[in-house]
């Protein structure tokens, strides 16, 4: 940070002064610089890897564009120039950029080579364009203009900003919001940037003390603006958004200047900016395509938290700068957004560079989520055009809302803030934002007057989620803007937001903010970074942000190194102050609760930051969780439906998608809000008020228990409970912003907890008031519905309920928020309601849980299932916790809906929710990850792609329906390929447009990898659509209809989404009521709100999920869950049987209904989480099983008993017996005749089969012959063609050769002349050459001799030199020895002399001393005797002493002299050492001289050698020249030879021509022969076909006769059996009557009451085999009316008597299927006109022939006599039978009557097939199931076949696509050996057919179309 700041600071400091002198220097020709510094000479090696500190957009294509956090690779640097420019690459783009805009992360090399530049270095690297007029870097980067106009513009900007701030909301919203910010900003930004550059220098110190972030921000932005902004300023002037962005940067720069004025202001402003970043929506965000504008947060976003004392104090200072700061808040976006908010972004840029880098992803999400960036900026990215227009529409609507809100403002003092017009910019930004604006509008006028931020705070309260992020943004803005207004607003805002919290909480937060703010100044950077990060995180997982918010409040702040904590505190505290109003009071309706919760959420954050609020928050959350666990799911699911809708919206807004999504939402809202947004707002307010009342009643308990709720929610407050759900939205956005700031997450957690409690309490109806509130909410919702048409009435209700609450709780903002969500969710909100609820439900529940609980999820959401749903809510919480951190889990569990919803759906759903995930069922169901969805949305127009995907889906559906079953896949593949290319083309175009757009916007949003990933996503989506259709509709044909209806949203969802769309507001209002007890009730007004969204979606998810169909509802549900569910659904067909699907569906439906019913029960009657300690599930299952078993038992025992009253008299019986006897006799005769006929017909059939086999074999042989002849013919034709081509080429070659020959002849003649000339020259040359050779030999001999002599001399020289060296060495050694000996000798002599002298002196001294001693003794003796001086010897004593003294002196002198001598000797030694050194150096020099002389001599010798070599080389050159001439002559000879060879080749070619002509003639003859052969073959083929046809006709006739005989026999058998039975009965009765003569009164109709004759064998599945001509279905010979089947068709096999052959006559008869029962032809029913062509072909000829040939077709014989009619009788052109099918056809009837459609069978879950359903010899599973419904049986009905021979029909199955066995063209029972085999015991396996039959099957199958 410091380095980056320093770079920016010095760049700004030094840039301007250097500009003037530098400009002329920077234009050395067409170059930026004369030299460049590289790591190597080619400048191709990397020097540095850096990270972008800011966004940069170059003035032209020579510069590379990048965004903050992008990785930049530096290859070289330009030398000189005031703005140092480097060249590098970002992704695949290469260009120049200012050095100071990147931070070096890694240095690859330290070496720098200065290389001159080339003009080609300064052209466009993309296209090479070099037509540039300006090569002055300073001019291009706009330094001069920025610098010159900085002061004036900055002042203007300040003034304009002040004016804008001061302007009323309308003016500011309308005029300033968009155009004004843009114009002044573009100009002002330049001036401000320049001023800031100068001021930044001054402020650099203050910035250091303050968050250097400001200085950095100023510098970064100033620099950035200086670089980028200046280039952009022109664009900004054109682009209001850009100008707004510039204005933002300008205002931020102004804020930097104000930083000089007050660092606190800047810090607060930056904090506000940070808060803004976190704030999902920007009330005042100006709508524009500019990225910066997107990032701008509206002033309204400033929270009442600004009211905090700290803000209040700072507010005064900021009041001075408030204009600028207001400008900043309005236009600035938070760091998360791109850190374009100059001041704040600067802080965040550097401190939050990490954030932005890490949050860059978030930045896209976060920065845009703030709503402004997203609203404005992201809109350009994703839907800049449409969304912008939509946003403008939303603005208009918002304006309408604002006007209505303004009127409301008159009613509500809070409205003034919204009037400040700041809400309108936000309104422009987002309808939801507009709703927020409306909410802000509802903010008290005093607040709005004092500070639009207060309104923003309230507005943020309404936004809830938005508030959480913007709260920080607002806090920042508030810090800046509200420093003035914060005093008033802090009072009002704190009073308003603190109504619930109580002023003390606000004060605490204010104090905390002060302290934190003071800390934040220093910590702001980190805090801002952390906050923005937290905001990102918070926005992403709002659930996390809840818990994480609490954690982040305490922990993230701590993480912020205390800076963030402080900043978080300040933000929280402002947020806390505003947070109650803004963060958790985003549900302004919650304001009381939120303020209570705000104290929880806002104050808690304050407490967390200042106190240990995290613990309190956790406790509160736990309480909330407990309450919510009971009710959170309902609450979340009910109110959260809206809240979640809003949450997703908010989260989306929070996410970068928020802008675009919000814009889309605005669009949808504006479109859908036909009513003025006032009415919608009022309706939503009313709904939210009532919903809040409901919640608040519940929340009052939980909140009051927490002690956070100072005020108990009024009924109006309860009305706002839906807005509390908005808090859930806030939780969602908190989750998003949780990533941005855990602090906000804490607040959101509190909010979410509050929301869950409120919705929970409302849903639980814990209090009678809550229930009443629910009813009120329902009434409100109904009223709102009415108000949708007459919103004013509801508006009055909303104001009544919400107005007071708004004043107290800031619920009016909540209302607006509710309105915003409701408005946004009128259409989007509703969809979002479903989506959020589904998301919650799905997130709460696992995919399985979704199935069950999604049905229940909405009831839970509505709170109907609350109590039983306590566990579900817990599960939801757990599920949410899974998505959220352990910390976030608390919040997630508290707000499981919020958590889970924001979590998974948050990713896909949130982006989509503003877009309406329901509007994007396909895309939303595909994306699990919000980031991927956001990324997807960033590059593409999602709505357009969704439309294309839906078109593709519809095309696939129609193709699937229209195409024949066997051809479905091919048709689908064609459609798929066509749409794939179309969609990919469109997607690439969108991507290119988006990339260019991003470049224009200076936003390098995408890397190449990201673009590639997005395109991969598009392709995956295409495959997803294709796969969905193939799996859904094929695997589950019965359910496929539902999926088609349901579409992507599921069958229920299609119908329900409209309801949800119609009632999103009501949905918000009456979450509890919204949950319909039954999906059918979704249409009810109450259910419309929650029920439609919640219940409808749950049933939808259930229905969709159960059938295994992918339900787009999964998208509304957690994205993860949705995708899991989707995957599970797609996989279900394979793994789940239809029965299981049906059971699951019924189970989920029952579970849902029970939940809805239980939810409606009074609270005291609702069941608990368990049943006396046992889980409900097993208890219910056992109870249901008991009931079912009892019912079955009762039915089997009691109801089965039938009264058997015999109504037949003896006479009747006797008559019947007689008749029966007669009939029996007749039948016996008939049977015998039929048996004979059958035998005869079997013989005929066998004969015909044999004949057919013979004929088919012959036909095959002929075919083989024909094929071989055709092949030979083709080969000959090819050879003939090749020969012709060769002939033509040879002819052409011959012509060319002739020309060459003529030319060659001419050249030969010329060459001959030349040769003659050359020959003479050559002779001369040879002579000269010979002479040269002789001279060369002489020279060589001389050279050898000289060389030998030279070698001998060298050897001698070397020997002599070696001898010299040896002698010199020995001489030196000896001389050294002599010297050493002499020295030692001298030393010894000197030492001896010294010693002698010393000895002499010492002896003298000793003798003298002895004398002295003697004399002293004598003197002592003589003292007494004589005093005379004379001694004995006559000497005087005095003289003696003198002598002694003299001697002593002498001795002293001797010692002195000796010391002097020693000194001299030492000097002498030193001199000797020097002498030795000089001697050694001399020797060394002499040695060197010798070496040099030797080197010189060697070089001279080498020189002579080289000269000799040079001479020899010159001679060689001469010789080579001569050789070259000789070779030329040889080549000329070769040329002549080649000419002769050419002539020979030409002759050969002429001969080849003749041969080719002959070959052509032969080819013609062959062709004639081939044609003749073909004619003969055709004739023979026709004759054979005719024979085959006649045989087949005969065979079919025989088969018909046999079947008729069989049928007659079977009927007779039945009748005989019946008669036997009757006989037995009669005999018994007769015996009884004889024994007991009892008169039985005859009862009329007795015969009819008896069992009808059993005619089972005549059923379709009877014993009749397939027609010999048809390889397929066996059916009775119903001529043209298939339904006219025998009565026995409905009998089971058990009811059929055995045939005389010893086997049951046929398999279990199938019920008439849909085709027969409904009268509609089934796809495979031949009788219905769908006779399969494959069937036809197989029946028209022998299987082998038909299948192999596929060409033989027989003429139709009119309507087929039976369903399995032979091909010959069916029209040849009839529709083909469907191909392989893995699922049964839709069954409409069962054996006992109509039955429900069975669930789809998985690919491996086909129902068991009857014997007839398999081709002979083909085991089950090897062939496709027939489509004919008659060929499918429900599982479990497999008949048992007794052992024995098969009936004639039982050997053949409806294998219409399979060939008959090898027996012959007529498919008849296989050989007797095969017939002897017992039939399979089940229908799953056909009886084994003969081997021939099985062998024929495989080729037939292969060849069947």
Curated annotation (Swiss-Prot):
The modification Phosphoserine is found at residues 226, 229, 873, 1428, 1663, 1675, 1703, 1724, 1738, 1742, 1890, 1904. Residues 23-1141, 1163-1173 are lumenal. The modification Asymmetric dimethylarginine is found at residue 1781. Residues 1748-1905 are annotated as: Proline-rich domain (PRD). Residues 1142-1162 dip into the membrane without crossing it. Residues 1208-1647 are annotated as: Mediates interaction with MIA2. It is found in: Endoplasmic reticulum membrane. Residues 1195-1905 are cytoplasmic. Residues 45-107 form the SH3 domain. One of its GO terms (cellular component) is membrane. One of its GO terms (biological process) is vesicle cargo loading. Residues 1776-1806 have a biased composition (Pro residues). The proline-rich domain (PRD) contains repeated PPP motifs. A single PPP motif is necessary and sufficient to mediate interaction with the COPII coat subunits SEC23A and SEC23B. This is Transport and Golgi organization protein 1 homolog. The lineage of its organism: Eukaryota, Metazoa, Chordata, Craniata, Vertebrata. The gene is MIA3.
């Amino acid at each position: 940070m410091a380095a980056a700041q320093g770079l920016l600071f010095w760049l700004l400091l030094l840039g301007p002064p250097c500009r003037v002198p530098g400009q002329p220097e920077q234009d050395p020709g067409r170059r930026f610089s004369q030299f460049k510094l590289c790591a190597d000479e080619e400048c191709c090696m990397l020097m540095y890897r850096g990270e972008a500190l800011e966004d940069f957009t170059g003035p032209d294509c020579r510069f590379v564009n990048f965004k903050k956090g992008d990785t930049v690779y530096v290859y070289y640097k330009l030398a000189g120039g005031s703005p140092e420019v480097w060249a590098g690459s970002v992704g695949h783009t290469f260009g120049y950029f200012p050095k100071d805009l990147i931070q070096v992360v890694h240095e690859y090399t330290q070496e720098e080579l200065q290389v001159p530049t080339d003009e080609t270095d300064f052209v466009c690297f993309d296209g090479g364009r070099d037509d540039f007029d300006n090569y002055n870097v300073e001019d291009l980067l706009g330094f001069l203009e920025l610098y010159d106009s900085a002061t004036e513009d900055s002042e203007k900007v300040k003034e304009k900003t002040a004016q804008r701030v001061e302007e009323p909301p309308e003016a500011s919203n309308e005029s300033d919001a968009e155009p004004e910010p843009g114009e002044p900003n573009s100009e002002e930004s330049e001036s401000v940037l320049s001023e800031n550059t100068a001021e930044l220098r001054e402020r650099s110190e203050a910035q250091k003390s303050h968050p250097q972030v400001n200085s950095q921000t100023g510098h970064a932005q100033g620099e950035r603006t200086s670089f980028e902004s200046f280039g952009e300023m022109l664009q900004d002037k054109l682009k209001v958004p850009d100008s707004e962005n510039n204005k933002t940067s300008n205002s931020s720069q102004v804020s930097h200047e104000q930083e000089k004025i007050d660092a606190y202001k800047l810090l607060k402003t930056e904090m506000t900016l940070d808060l803004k970043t976190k704030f999902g929506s920007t009330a005042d965000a100006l709508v524009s395509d500019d990225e910066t504008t997107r990032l701008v947060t509206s002033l309204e976003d400033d929270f009442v938290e600004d009211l905090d004392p700290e803000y209040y104090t700072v507010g005064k200072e900021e009041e001075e700068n408030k204009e600028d700061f207001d400008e900043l808040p309005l236009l600035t976006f938070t760091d998360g957004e791109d850190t374009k908010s100059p001041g704040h972004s600067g802080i965040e840029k550097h401190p939050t560079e990490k954030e932005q880098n890490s949050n860059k992803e978030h930045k896209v999400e976060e920065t845009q989520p703030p709503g402004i960036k997203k609203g404005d900026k992201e809109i350009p990215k994703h839907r800049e055009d449409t969304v912008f227009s939509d946003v403008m529409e939303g603005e208009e609507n918002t304006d309408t809302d604002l006007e209505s809100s303004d009127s409301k403002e008159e009613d509500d003092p809070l409205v003034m803030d919204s009037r400040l017009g700041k809400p309108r910019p936000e309104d422009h930004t987002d309808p939801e934002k507009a709703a927020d604006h409306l909410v802000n509008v509802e903010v008290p006028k005093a607040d709005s007057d004092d500070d639009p931020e207060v309104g923003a705070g309230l507005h943020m309260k309404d936004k809830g989620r938005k508030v959480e992020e913007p709260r920080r943004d607002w806090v920042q803005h508030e810090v800046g803007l509200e420093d003035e207004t914060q005093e008033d607003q802090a009072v009002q805002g704190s009073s308003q937001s603190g109504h619930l919290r109580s002023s003390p909480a606000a004060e605490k937060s204010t104090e905390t903010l002060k302290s934190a703010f003071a800390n934040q100044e220093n910590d702001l950077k980190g805090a801002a970074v952390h906050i923005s990060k937290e905001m990102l995180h918070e926005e992403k997982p709002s659930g996390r942000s809840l818990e994480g918010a609490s954690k982040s409040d305490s922990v993230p702040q701590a993480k912020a190194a205390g800076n963030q904590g402080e900043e978080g505190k300040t933000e929280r505290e402002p947020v806390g102050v505003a947070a109650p109003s803004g963060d958790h009071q985003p549900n302004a309706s919650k304001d009381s609760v939120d303020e209570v919760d705000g104290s929880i959420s806002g104050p808690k954050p304050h407490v967390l930051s200042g106190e240990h609020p995290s613990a309190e928050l956790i406790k509160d959350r736990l309480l909330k969780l407990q309450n919510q666990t009971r009710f959170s799911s309902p609450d979340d699911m009910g109110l959260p439906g809206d809240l979640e809708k809003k949450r997703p919206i908010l989260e989306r807004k929070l996410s970068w998608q928020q802008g675009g999504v919000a814009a889309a939402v605005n669009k949808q809202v504006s479109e859908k809000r036909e009513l003025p947004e006032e009415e919608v707002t009022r309706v939503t307010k009313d709904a939210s008020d009532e919903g809040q009342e409901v919640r608040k009643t519940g929340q009052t308990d939980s909140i009051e228990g927490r002690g956070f709720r100072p005020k108990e929610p009024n009924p109006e407050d309860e009305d706002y409970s839906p807005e509390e759900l908005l808090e859930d939205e806030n939780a969602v956005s908190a989750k998003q912003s949780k990533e941005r700031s855990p602090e906000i997450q804490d607040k959101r957690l509190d909010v979410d907890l509050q929301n869950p409690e409120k919705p929970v309490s409302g849903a639980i109806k814990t209090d009678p008031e809550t229930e009443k509130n629910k009813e009120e909410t329902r009434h409100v919702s109904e009223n709102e519905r009415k108000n949708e048409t007459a919103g004013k009435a509801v508006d009055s209700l909303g104001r009544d309920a919400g107005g007071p609450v708004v004043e107290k709780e800031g619920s009016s903002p909540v209302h607006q928020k509710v309105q915003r969500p409701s408005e946004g969710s009128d259409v989007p909100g509703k969809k979002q309601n479903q989506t959020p609820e589904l998301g919650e439900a799905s997130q709460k529940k696992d995919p399985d849980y979704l199935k069950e609980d999604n049905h229940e999820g909405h009831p839970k959401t509505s709170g109907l299932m609350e109590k039983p749903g306590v566990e579900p809510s817990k599960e939801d919480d757990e599920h949410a916790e899974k998505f959220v951190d352990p910390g976030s889990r608390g919040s997630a569990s508290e707000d499981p809906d919020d958590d889970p919803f924001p979590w998974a759906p948050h990713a896909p759903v949130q982006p989509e929710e503003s877009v309406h995930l329901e509007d994007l069922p396909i895309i939303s169901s595909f994306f699990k990850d919000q980031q991927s969805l956001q990324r997807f949305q960033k590059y593409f127009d999602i709505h357009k792609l969704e439309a294309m995907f839906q078109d593709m889906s519809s095309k696939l559906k129609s193709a699937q329906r229209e195409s024949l079953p066997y051809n479905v896949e091919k048709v689908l593949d064609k459609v798929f390929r066509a749409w794939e290319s179309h969609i990919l083309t469109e997607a690439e175009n969108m991507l290119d447009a988006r990339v260019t757009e991003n470049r224009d916007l200076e936003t390098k949003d995408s890397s190449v990898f990201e673009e590639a990933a997005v395109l991969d996503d598009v392709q995956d989506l295409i495959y997803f659509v294709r796969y969905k259709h193939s799996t859904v509709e094929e695997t589950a044909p019965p359910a496929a209809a539902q999926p088609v209806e349901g579409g992507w949203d599921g069958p229920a969802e299609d119908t329900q989404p409209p309801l949800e769309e119609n009632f999103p507001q009501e949905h918000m209002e009456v979450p509890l009521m919204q949950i319909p007890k039954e999906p059918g009730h979704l249409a009810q007004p109450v259910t419309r709100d929650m029920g439609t969204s919640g219940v409808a979606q749950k049933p939808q998810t259930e229905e969709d999920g159960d059938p295994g169909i992918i339900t787009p509802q999964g998208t509304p549900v957690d994205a993860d869950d949705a995708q899991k569910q989707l995957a599970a659904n797609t996989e279900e067909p394979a793994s789940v049987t239809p029965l299981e699907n049906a059971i699951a569906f019924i189970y989920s439906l029952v579970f849902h209904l029970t939940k809805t019913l239980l939810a409606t029960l009074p609270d005291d009657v609702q069941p608990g989480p368990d049943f006396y300690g046992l889980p409900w599930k097993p208890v219910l299952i056992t109870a249901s099983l008991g009931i079912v078993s009892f019912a079955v038992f009762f039915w089997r025992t009691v109801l089965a008993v039938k009264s058997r009253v015999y109504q037949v008299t003896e006479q009747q019986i006797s008559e019947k017996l007689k008749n029966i006897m007669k009939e029996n006799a007749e039948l016996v005769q008939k049977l015998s005749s039929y048996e004979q006929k059958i035998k005869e017909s079997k013989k005929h059939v066998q004969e015909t089969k044999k004949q057919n086999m013979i004929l088919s074999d012959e036909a095959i042989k002929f075919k083989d012959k024909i094929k071989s002849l055709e092949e030979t013919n083709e080969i000959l034709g090819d050879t003939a063609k090749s020969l012709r081509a060769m002939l033509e080429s040879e002819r052409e070659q011959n012509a060319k050769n002739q020309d060459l020959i003529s030319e060659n002849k001419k050249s030969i003649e010329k060459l001959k002349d030349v040769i003659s000339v050359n020959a003479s020259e050559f002779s001369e040359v040879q002579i000269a050459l010979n002479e040269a050779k002789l001279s060369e030999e002489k020279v060589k001999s001389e050279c050898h001799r000289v060389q030998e002599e030279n070698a001998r001399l060298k050897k001698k020289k070397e020997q002599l030199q070696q001898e010299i060296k040896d002698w010199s060495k020995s001489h030196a050694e000896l001389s050294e020895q002599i010297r050493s000996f002499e020295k030692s000798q001298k030393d010894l002599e000197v030492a001896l002399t010294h010693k002698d002298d010393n000895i002499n002196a010492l002896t003298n001294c000793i003798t003298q001393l002895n004398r002295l001693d003697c004399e002293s003794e004598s003197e002592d003796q003589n003292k007494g005797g004589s005093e005379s001086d004379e001694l004995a010897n006559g000497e005087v004593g005095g003289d003696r002493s003198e002598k002694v003294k003299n001697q002593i002196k002498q001795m002293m002198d001797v010692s002195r002299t000796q010391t002097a001598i020693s000194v001299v000797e030492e000097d002498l030694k030193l001199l000797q050492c020097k002498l030795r050194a000089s001697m050694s150096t001399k020797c060394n020099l002499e040695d060197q001289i010798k070496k040099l002389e030797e080197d010189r001599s060697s070089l001279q010798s080498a020189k002579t050698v080289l000269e000799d070599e040079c001479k020899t080389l010159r001679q060689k050159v001469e010789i080579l020249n001569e050789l070259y001439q000789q070779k030329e002559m040889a080549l000329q000879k070769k040329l002549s030879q080649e000419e002769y060879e050419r002539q020979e080749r030409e002759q050969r070619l002429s001969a080849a021509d003749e041969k080719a002509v002959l070959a052509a003639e032969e080819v013609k003859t062959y062709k004639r022969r081939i044609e003749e052969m073909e004619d003969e073959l055709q004739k023979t083929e026709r004759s054979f076909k005719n024979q085959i046809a006649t045989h087949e006709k005969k065979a079919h006739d025989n088969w018909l006769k046999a079947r008729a005989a069989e049928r007659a026999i079977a009927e007779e058998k039945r009748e005989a059996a019946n008669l036997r039975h009757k006989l037995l009965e009669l005999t018994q009765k007769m015996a009884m009557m004889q024994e007991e003569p009892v008169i039985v009164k005859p009862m009329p109709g007795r015969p009819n009451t008896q069992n009808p004759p059993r005619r089972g064998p005549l059923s379709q599945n009877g014993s009749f085999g397939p027609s010999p001509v048809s390889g397929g279905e066996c059916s009775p010979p119903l001529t043209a009316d298939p339904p006219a089947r025998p009565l026995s068709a409905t009998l089971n096999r058990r009811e059929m008597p055995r045939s005389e052959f010893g086997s049951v006559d046929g398999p279990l008869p199938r019920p008439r299927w849909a085709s027969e029962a409904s009268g509609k032809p089934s796809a495979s029913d031949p009788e219905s006109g769908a006779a399969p062509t494959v069937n036809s072909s197989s029946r028209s000829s022998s299987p082998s022939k038909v299948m192999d040939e596929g060409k033989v077709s027989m003429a139709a014989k009119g309507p087929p006599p039976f369903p399995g009619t032979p091909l010959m009788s069916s029209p040849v052109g009839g529709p083909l039978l469907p191909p392989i099918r893995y699922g049964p056809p839709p069954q409409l009837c069962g054996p006992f009557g109509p039955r429900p459609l069975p669930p789809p069978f998985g690919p491996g879950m086909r129902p068991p097939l009857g014997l007839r359903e398999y081709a002979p010899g083909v085991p089950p599973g090897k062939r496709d199931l027939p489509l004919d419904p008659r060929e499918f049986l429900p599982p479990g009905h497999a008949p048992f076949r007794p052992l024995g021979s098969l009936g004639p029909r039982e050997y053949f199955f409806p294998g219409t696509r399979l060939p008959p066995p090898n027996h012959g063209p007529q498919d008849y029972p296989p050989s007797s050996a095969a017939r002897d085999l017992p039939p399979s015991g089940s229908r799953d396996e056909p009886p084994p057919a003969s081997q021939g039959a099985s062998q024929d099957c495989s080729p037939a199958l292969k060849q069947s179309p």
